[in-house]
């Protein structure tokens, strides 16, 4: 798995200053929650900094990644990066950063949530909403 500095730099290069600052705030909040709920702070830090890596992709980039990684998007997700970025971001993190399945799920569901979320998923979900 890539280290924090490598992921930080890669995410920073792909996002606007405003979106990157949001990722920093989300990370800080998520680490606070990780301390409270006994989750791995380093893992949380990596997930949170990378959670929006796909948020500002162009439609062309989305199409390319969907084809490359065989990502299923429904019709609404295809037209709305606000919904699809979490799925696409999870796949980017899996293949480019070597995130494990648990980390990828936290990214995949950080926008919509889901039933029976793990503590890690909840931390990222809430930190994103409040960060």
Features from the language model and the residues they span:
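Non-catalytic terminal extensions that flank enzyme cores
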Residues: 1-4
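Divalent metal-dependent catalytic cores for phosphoryl transfer on phosphate-bearing substrates
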Residues: 6-14, 31-131
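N-terminal glycine-rich anion-binding loops that anchor highly charged ligand groups
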Residues: 22
